[in-house]
A protein has these predicted regions:
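Alpha-helical cap/lid subdomain in secreted, periplasmic
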Residues: 6-16, 32-174
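A short beta-strand-loop structural module common to alpha/beta enzyme folds
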Residues: 17-29
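Glycine- and acidic-residue-enriched helix-capping/strand-helix junction motifs
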Residues: 1-2
Length: 174
């Protein structure tokens, strides 16, 4: 019921003959993702979906640090000629307006700078219309991670962007 199997099925149902590889690590930060980039891209890779920053946010890490790490990942993808879908997040107001402004701005700014596709908000499909809080019925008991139905909604919202990403992929990697 996780994201990768659900997205894989969604893509297959739409005729996309691709294999998704989950290079994520539970509890991962942007620093961990940046540190593992070479390893993650060591096999045949045709594109990247970068969905990092949530754990940075939970830890209250300076958005400048998260931004630098995401930039390392985007530079690494660019140097390999890989198209990227960058998945954004929005900070709550818990850390103050300056933190929120800097955190929220980094995803669209980096996507524009590196020519990445952008999904503005990973969690938007889990928010009732005209609300700013997540629908708790779509979340696991921890209140942080989406449950199977929540993942289904995220996949439905992100899927078209993933198809756009696949359209940017050249011949298959060898």
């Amino acid at each position: 019921d996780g994201f990768v199997p659900q997205m894989q099925a969604w893509l297959r149902d739409r005729g996309a003959d691709v294999t998704l590889v989950n290079a994520g690590v539970s509890g991962d930060t942007t620093a961990g993702g940046a540190a593992r980039l070479d390893w993650s891209l060591s096999g045949p890779v045709d594109a990247l979906i970068v969905n990092l920053g949530g754990n940075d946010l939970l830890r209250g890490l300076d958005p400048a640090v998260s931004r630098d790490n995401l930039e390392k990942i985007l530079k690494g993808a660019r140097s390999r000629g890989l198209p990227v879908l960058l998945v954004g997040l929005q900070a709550s107001t818990n850390y103050g307006p300056d933190f929120k402004l800097r955190f929220d701005a980094m995803y669209p700014e980096l996507a524009a700078r590196y020519g990445a596709l952008l999904l503005t908000s990973y969690f938007a499909p889990l928010m009732p219309e005209s609300q700013t809080a997540l629908d708790r019925n779509l979340m696991q008991a921890d209140g942080i991670h989406p449950n199977a139905e929540g993942v289904k909604r995220i996949v439905a919202a992100m899927g078209p962007k993933v198809l756009d990403l696949l359209a940017e992929v050249g011949p298959p990697a060898q």
